[in-house]
Amino acid sequence: MTKIVSALDTASATFRENATAMDALVDDLQLRTAAAAVGGSERSREKHLSRGKLLPRDRVERLLDPGSPFLEIGALAANGMYEGNVHGAGMIAGIGRVSGREVMVVCNDPTIKGGAYYPMTVKKHLRAQEIAMQNRLPCVYLVDSGGANLPHQAEVFPDRDHFGRIFYNQANMSAEGIPQVAVVMGSCTAGGAYVPAMSDETVIVRKQGTIFLAGPPLVKAATGEVISAEDLGGADVHARTSGVADHYAANDEHALHTARRIVGTLNTVKQTDLDITEPREPAHDPAELGGVIPADIRAPYDVREVIARLVDGSEFDEFKKLYGETLVTGFARLYGMPVGIIANNGILFSESAQKGAHFIQLCAQRGIPLVFLQNITGFMVGSKYEAGGIAKDGAKLVTAVSTYRGPKFTVIIGGSYGAGNYGMCGRAYSPRFLFMWPNARISVMGGEQAAAVLATVKRDGMEARGEDWSLEDEAAFKAPVREAYEAEGNPYYSTARMWDDGIIAPEDTRRVLGLSLSAALNAPIEKTKFGIFRM
């Protein structure tokens, strides 16, 4: 492969300015992530510990193989969306290694609102299951939750992608041979009781875990029977009498040891048709990425400088280098695994879109995973380009992205605007994973453009009615539009709503993509069948 020759001057004032700006964004990200990782209030955590329980993150750590990485999903989900701090939507989710196997871990955090399911908690749980299904990852559920958050029941209970979908997914994953393991370490109430009841194997902790469709208060109200939670649905009931649980644990440590032993018996073997070579570090330091990206998101730069700091040996065999130059495509390796890279280097023209579609066809035919690096304002507009067929050429790219059946991974490294988001494998196009950098922006268009469009429509309407609109009134009209777009395009607004799988520091991108690719190799790469490409 051809080694990328970097033109970056790491001693320049521009590099230092860019690096300083990115460092500030990364520092903010780390502060937010650390605050969310604490979980609930100090009082809630102390109460949890006083019951002899491990804190949720300690549970996850004890479950995983010592020293192994954990690819967390949605670490900042729900932040700022609900009254109080519902950090991480009250749940820890991610991919880790247990007994040598990659698994999806879903861990309730009872120190946050009792582990209750808010709408975003449901969305996060379902996203974790979606990742598990796509990549054929065994699921380990560390259950300690009071069930649905009742004040939000209309957004949690009845719809297709609400609480009930969790159990639908469990049943279908088990049917597909994707193991489901539950460890009941606390409350497991109402519909939540189906998590352990529908798992392949279930562990329950003595004097701590409880499983029941109706808790003691509801039983008393409905039948008049007075009974304790332990006598109604504790470990002795379910391990000795009902058979709902398969393994009886003395405490959290024992339960997690049992779960590790169960995963060790799953007899799952990662198989891949990829030509994997010995991994090599990039020739150019990933720590320099902060200095590559301009502090002004609108400023241009050569995206090859990013690729050079992500791929093995900084080697990249570029495809159609001289054609459609605003889209960079080519082959590389990440941790020895072959990938096809599609990266924005400007606005998308017809030639760029055709080139991208052609490259995706090549990767589909060869069974090579795709990595999208998004920094896109959209497709070119104007009468010349409409007459030239930009709509049908853009549709070719969107069709190719939509129908490609191999693993796709997206990192938003700058702007993600309008139809450019679609052509570059945004969330709607089912990338296996989608991450954002802290400088990223995502919106149907920029705030300035949105304000100008809406102002033009309003002015045209007023002029048609013979009304005047002063420049002062127009400015007052535009200001809140710009502010709203700026707020809603912010990466933290996106990640709170799980439009992505997390915000990551640029220098962590190679590692995150490597873990994502490794997880994807647990599932076979499907053959792609493309639809009609309008010529």
Regions found by a protein language model. Give the residues of each.
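Ligand-binding clefts of soluble mixed alpha/beta catalytic domains
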Residues: 1-535
